[in-house]
Amino acid sequence: MILCRGLFMAVIGIDLGTTNSCVAVMEGGDAKAIENSEGARTTPSIVAFTDSEVLVGDPAKRQATTNAKNTIYASKRLIGRRYQDTRDIKTSYDIVSAKNGDAWIKVRDKDYSPSQIGALILEKMKETAERHLGCKVEKAVITVPAYFDDAQRQATKDAGKIAGLDVIRIINEPTAAALAYGLNKSDKQKVIAVYDLGGGTFDVSILEIADGVFEVKSTNGDTMLGGEDFDHAIMEYLMDDFKKSTGIDLHSDAMAMQRIKEAAEKAKIELSSRMETDINLPFLSSDSTGPKHLSLKLTRATFENLVSDLVKRTIEPCKKALKDAGISADKIDEVVLVGGMTRVPKIIQTVKEFFGKEPHKGVNPDEVVAIGAAIQGGILAGDVRDVLLLDVTPLSLGIETLGGVFTPLIERNTTIPTKKSQVFSTAEDGQTAVTIKVFQGERKMANDNKLLGQFSLEGIPPAPRGMPQIEVTFDIDANGIVHVSAKDKASGKEQAIRIQSSGGLTDDEIQNMIKEAESKAEEDEKRKKFVEVKNNAENLVHSTEKSLKEHGDKISNADKLDIENAIRDLKDCISKDNIEDTDTMQNKLDHLMKVSMKLGEALYSNTNNATAGDNNTTDTGSSSNSDGSKVVDSDYQEIDKKDGK
């Protein structure tokens, strides 16, 4: 496939979501979401490992019930996280601790990093864009929740790299939504709130939009609050009801759990437009008395009662975001709803009550983030002009100082990119080395915040404590990714690193995963070719057998035997179902097509003979000339050309 050039030097925008993902691209000055191979503009963020292949999106979702243990969903909740921080996450698949303490996913006998799973979804998005554009895509802008920390942002960028993408920018989801909302609006200056409740995370951002400048004033959120939690609340309700009526606890039954999860998600969606819904799951389990079924009505009122605490949890981040922006709720001109969960009536009502105004519903909550990412891609590519985006860092960044105190160097909601330095000194006499521990968070004590990483500055000349001057510099790039350096002013010794936490993927691991992904792509292409050849072979066998049965008497016995032998050989090859036999199967298919042409020739010959026989029949209403040619008599009417009649 050729590389996109000229007008199609495309930078795609990807919303890598917890529940669904979406890809968009700029076309003719407008950003549009692209349909995938299944005809939908959103793709389930689900990856399934079967015996023979890896499935992504709708095909993975369709087989989840029968392959629950090997079907991975909501992996975004694990990306860039430590195993100890994920113990409350309930899934049908196994979450394990990697050697470095990160949360990874176990499938059969192999462990996968969440970045690898994310890469498979990103590959699907990349393929969707390439199919639409008709050329190869390399560059992308990928969105992340505004409240993602450095490790989560870096892990997302790693996922893009594994997928074969050059991630030229990581952009916050609410900011992307604001870009999509306000790009072509010529209104006066506006202050908007973006309320983004997705499948796995919640963000709220306050932005000021004026004359093409999109300035984020503050952001807040909860990276463990989203639609998955609403689904889980319904699931627990259904399983409690089932246990009360049957005495059976379904928590350890992976297949039953998957069926309940699907039913819970379906019920949640239906209750956005209906007051009640029926949930029927026959043969959900069984005991010595026979099969057990689940059947009940779930009303909107019951659902709202189940999730009331989850809805309330979105309010505190809204309060904090307004406070940090120095704005009261009544000064917000418009509230933009983003994320599929904002279709829930209780959410809409809560937002309306808190902000005191009807929320704006003019954007598609499932596509707006990807569209905003595509616009940002257009800005970076120079296709979209006169637009300036000023984003912020969501959490304070600093280091651990004497007594375990957290000393921030860059406060939360500081506009990025940014750079700040501060001078520190030693805590002991004669100290020749210092360890710089970098943290992110809002707590007063360092250990209560997220440790991003650490490094040492050595070779400091011995001196009384407090005398050496060590300058620590924090640099946050436009992706929100942190770079830190420390320099001893006396000796000039300097140590600089891009923060990589004690977890995270090393460069070698990323390269190995890239090679594995490329290898998988080759295997997938090989599998695809085999399936296509096999399908063609089965179709040809079926049609040839049918033709032979109906018209075999019209060819010689020798030709008939050749066809029968070719059919048998191809059937034998098909029955082996061996991917290594693809070329052999193609050759046998070609041979059957060649020998079966005798059958086609005989059919056409018989048809032509029949037609010739018909032509010897005397026609009525015709006469012959002396040379034997036919003259067809016909009625005619003369037209007076002058009158035009």
Swiss-Prot record:
Residues 606-645 are annotated as: Disordered. Keywords: ATP-binding, Chaperone, Nucleotide-binding, Phosphoprotein, Stress response. PROSITE patterns: HSP70_1, HSP70_2, HSP70_3. The modification Phosphothreonine is found at residue 201. Residues 606-629 have a biased composition (Low complexity). HAMAP family: DnaK. Acts as a chaperone. This is Chaperone protein DnaK. It comes from Ehrlichia ruminantium (strain Gardel). The lineage of its organism: Bacteria, Pseudomonadati, Pseudomonadota, Alphaproteobacteria, Rickettsiales.
